[in-house]
Amino acid sequence: MTETFFDKPLACREIKEIPGLLEFDIPVRGDNRGWFKENFQKEKMLPIGFPERFFEEGKLQNNVSFSRQHVLRGLHAEPWDKYISVADDGKVLGAWVDLREGETFGNVYQTVIDASKGMFVPRGVANGFQVLSETVSYSYLVNDYWALDLKPKYAFVNYADPSLGITWENLAAAEVSEADKNHPLLSDVKPLKPKDL
């Protein structure tokens, strides 16, 4: 859990390093039984800055990945927007890299995410995380349906690229897929044009 976990007011912050990347504080209510949160409620999120365009195509798919400590996933930019959060008592170190064409190409942001925080990640921004807790259930709500024919639209950057300056926890102990180990360095990534997003 982060330093302030329970009873934060619902709030949204724009991340200046990466336009469109939003960080949300999510109210978590706890007692002797555990805790409860509304992970996402459209009526409350839109007025504080959640993008209305997320719902334009009427497609929503919610995914949950389960990972163990030291697992590192990323960095992937899929052809959809996503709202990510942690669905249990776990904690991750999240990292994002702007792969969109423009002056913020290559900009990086990272923060720790637990159940009291959510992130809106616009398409074209690569997303990755490393598990800091014993396990974590990582939830991501996306605005398109997964389909194999969308794979060619994915973009990737290597999590260990020193030019990114990402500070991972104990990278030598990280459990990483072969695919993620072989993603290109930022210098070899072709910036994503608006028409490709």
Swiss-Prot record:
It comes from the Bacteria. One of its GO terms (molecular function) is dTDP-4-dehydrorhamnose 3,5-epimerase activity. The active site is at H76, Y140. It holds the Pfam family dTDP_sugar_isom. InterPro entries: RmlC-like (IPR000888), RmlC-like_jellyroll (IPR014710), RmlC_Cupin_sf (IPR011051). Keywords: Isomerase. One of its GO terms (biological process) is polysaccharide biosynthetic process. This is Protein RmlC homolog. The lineage of its organism: Bacteria, Bacillati, Bacillota, Bacilli, Lactobacillales.
